Amino acid sequence: MRIVGAIFSIAVLAGHAHAEDDAAIEDVISSQLSAFNARDVDSAWQYASPMIQRLFGNPRNFGAMVENGYPMVWTNEVTQFLELTPLEGRQLQRVLIRDAGGVPHVLEYLMVETPDGWRIDGVSILPAPEVGA
């Protein structure tokens, strides 16, 4: 009976840790999206992974890339978190974002855990699903 209790306890703790990761990942993405809406690129930069920060060098370059390459992130209206999928020590978080014109976009955020918490390690715009038949 002790073994069953121990296994149950481990399962509960693992589920709790997973829920905390889910919430932390959503918080990082939401915070960065809010920072972009406020045009606070310095704050948005803090949610980028060390690899992304090395790639762009400074918040200004990073902000210009987002403004020009990800307009639905630069000015976003509504965010809905979809599935979260583990991937080789990282997490892929799909997010439905509506841009300023109300057009929906599905983005996939690659999340990496750092000593400072979860950070965004890349974003891909997924193709829109086909409608009709």
Where are these regions (language model features)?
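Sec/Tat signal peptide C-region and signal peptidase I cleavage site
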Residues: L13-A19
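Residue-level detector of flexible, active-site-proximal loop/helix-junction positions
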Residues: I10, M51, P127
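Short solvent-exposed beta->alpha transition segments
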Residues: A23-D27, S31, V41-E88
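Exposed beta-sheet edge and beta->alpha loop/turn motif
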Residues: E83-A133
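Sec-dependent signal peptide recognition
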Residues: M1-S9
